[in-house]
């Protein structure tokens, strides 16, 4: 195992090219942890195309060509990653500050019930469409087995629906 991290780690890579990228990663629990339903909703609320908070804060304002969140639900602890591919006009520092502000706004201001309901609906639909056919079902069950809990395949829809707006602030 890796030694305990005692402080933030920052990596800066400078290469020739026009596309700047900013990514921030925060440690999250292993995939079997009870927080994963809330983390899945946060991925949707912050990282969704067109409706996500990062999209509205960066892409709508011409600061990024693309924004994303990525949090793999793994057997071991992993990272919740927030990112943006920048436009030539945007600076890395500016994009990082905007991402951090959106995270802080979510923590301090919370999530309105309409935004939460929309995120739950999108995830629910994606879950059920992903289970359309034997390949999709086998793929999802295998992912959950690899994560360490096959029953998460069955329980995810109920877990997502049970998450409250307050629970999202605590994760």
Put a short name on every predicted segment:
Residues 1-33, 44-93, 114-125, 132, ...:
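Non-catalytic beta-strand/loop surface segments
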Residues 100-111:
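A common structural junction motif
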Residues 107, 151-154:
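C-terminal soluble interaction/assembly domains
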Residues 95-99:
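Hydrophobic alpha-helical membrane-association signature
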Residues 77, 148-152:
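Acidic/histidine-rich, surface-exposed loop or edge segments in extracytoplasmic proteins
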Residues 142-149, 160:
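C-terminal, helix-dominated tail/subdomain
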Residues 35-37:
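Zinc-dependent metallopeptidase catalytic helix centered on the HExxH motif
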């Amino acid at each position: 195992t890796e030694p305990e991290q005692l402080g933030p780690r920052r990596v800066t890579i400078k290469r020739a090219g026009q596309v700047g990228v900013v990514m921030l990663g925060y440690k999250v629990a292993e995939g079997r942890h009870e927080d994963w339903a809330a983390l899945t909703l946060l991925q949707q609320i912050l990282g969704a195309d067109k409706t996500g908070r990062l999209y509205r804060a960066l892409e709508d304002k011409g600061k990024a060509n693309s924004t994303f969140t990525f949090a793999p639900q793994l057997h071991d602890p992993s990272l919740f990653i927030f990112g943006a591919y920048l436009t030539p006009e945007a600076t890395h520092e500016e994009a990082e500050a905007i991402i951090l502000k959106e995270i802080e706004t979510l923590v301090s201001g919370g999530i309105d019930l309409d935004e939460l309901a929309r995120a739950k609906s999108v995830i629910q639909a994606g879950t059920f469409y992903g289970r359309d056919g034997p390949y999709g079902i086998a793929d999802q069950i295998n992912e959950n087995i690899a994560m360490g809990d096959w029953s998460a395949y069955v329980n995810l829809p109920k877990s997502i629906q049970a998450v409250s707006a307050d629970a999202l602030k605590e994760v």
